[in-house]
């Protein structure tokens, strides 16, 4: 089994405190901005009101994405390693300390994250799969293969009946839908029972019992290198940022068809997020200092906002009317006002920031 360096694992498992990292102790706000540093291997806890980092905690090497538990007390970080590593780092946000890692075993390359009630949904690139970890039992209790290469980012609908993933190297989007299947019939080769005068007996097929739940997958081809994506606030459309083609693919979720392929010339596009009102889509690019802004109604570029020398993670702030953009080459998170579409501040969260998330303590 592949592992990352043992010193890091022991460092995390020991529950290292913020005092050990030389940080002054401050209470974690009820609502916190979480930001990863890929270079420093840390998670920063930021006060969104003051934009000050109040604490940092260690995570494993090559951290990419972060998400908070539904109660806002714990953070989970995917330790990616280009598909080699197999761990989720765990941070106690109240105690501001690292907890023992979650070993994902053969589910190598965890990356995209989402919450499913009290559980954590994650992609596993190396296994071409998605899976769910249950913190209550400390077990992975569900795995579903996609059959696609580099299953990277993931989204689950609010009713938890559909899951969407981008599959970078297959240039596809997977739509996994929860379906109910009829009872199974008798085993192969078994002689079916006969009803009156040789007719089939009434009722469901024998041998199968009750209807059962399963998942049905629809695979939709999109532009090459699709990675970042988002679902419109009304749930009608899914847009992907296709890094290799430089295009944006627009999928109608009702028909499950590509409505449009926009020639955005967005080579290297890494993330795409809709504004809370759904009127704009923001696209970050790894090798370009401008944040692209698209009008979703016309599906045309609306503006570009200079934010630095390249960017990755995007996080919307519905309460504050802001977007936070992780600018890796510049070692800061840019704060963008969504009304003026201008940069209003920067946050030093550590070297090469990437994954961003909210934690709201219940």
Model-based region annotation:
Residues 1-11:
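Bacterial N-terminal signal peptides that target proteins for export
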